[in-house]
């Protein structure tokens, strides 16, 4: 929750979505599907895991849609970092793989949903709505009061250093 806004005002604001997928076409398709919605706004895009972490820290979205197979850092690694650095964020993993990866990822990392891309946009929209409506006031309050972790995972630091 924005620090200076009353809880009621925050709850009425459009929820902010960050889309992280290495496919430009997938990102554009999702943006086009959500374009007419007033309850959700796409606040940013990322084409790899490292970019998703940086943008999420800066933009503080309510929900992040992650592709599992991304360059730099895959969706599972990215989700793990995000859960530590962006408190209260909801995460949906959107993948070409079967949903069989879902049970491990949802329990071990805390991902809210794992969807197969072949299931299509209707399933994705349903998962987005579920993730956003199940975000209770308590979670919003925790998000407002918790501070993101100051440290980054060593693997992220190594990848950043190797890019320089």
Predicted regions and their residues:
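Conserved sequence signature across two-component system core domains
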Residues: 20-21, 46, 64
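The C-terminal output helix
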Residues: 129-144
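Alpha4 helix (beta4-alpha4-beta5 surface) of REC/receiver domains from two-component response regulators
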Residues: 77, 97-115, 119-126
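Receiver (REC) domain active-site loop signature in two-component systems and cognate sites
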Residues: 70
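Active-site beta3 strand of CheY-like receiver
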Residues: 59-65
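Conserved acidic segment of CheY-like receiver
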Residues: 13-26, 30, 34
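Acidic catalytic/metal-coordinating carboxylates
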Residues: 48-51, 74-77
């Amino acid at each position: 929750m924005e620090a200076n806004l009353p809880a009621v005002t925050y709850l009425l604001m459009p929820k902010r979505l960050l889309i992280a997928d290495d496919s430009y076409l997938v990102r554009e398709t999702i943006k086009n599907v959500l374009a007419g919605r007033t309850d959700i706004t796409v606040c940013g895009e990322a084409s790899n895991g490292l970019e998703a972490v940086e943008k999420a820290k800066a933009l503080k979205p309510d929900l992040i849609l992650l592709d599992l197979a991304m360059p730099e850092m895959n969706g599972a690694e990215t989700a793990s970092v995000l859960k530590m650095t962006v408190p209260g964020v909801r995460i949906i993993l959107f993948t070409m793989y079967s949903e069989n990866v879902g049970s491990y990822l949802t329990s071990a990392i805390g991902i809210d949903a794992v969807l197969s891309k072949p299931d299509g946009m209707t399933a994705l929209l349903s998962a987005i709505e579920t993730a956003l409506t199940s975000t209770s006031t308590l979670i919003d309050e925790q998000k407002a009061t918790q501070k993101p972790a100051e440290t980054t995972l060593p693997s992220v630091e190594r990848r950043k250093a190797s890019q320089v």
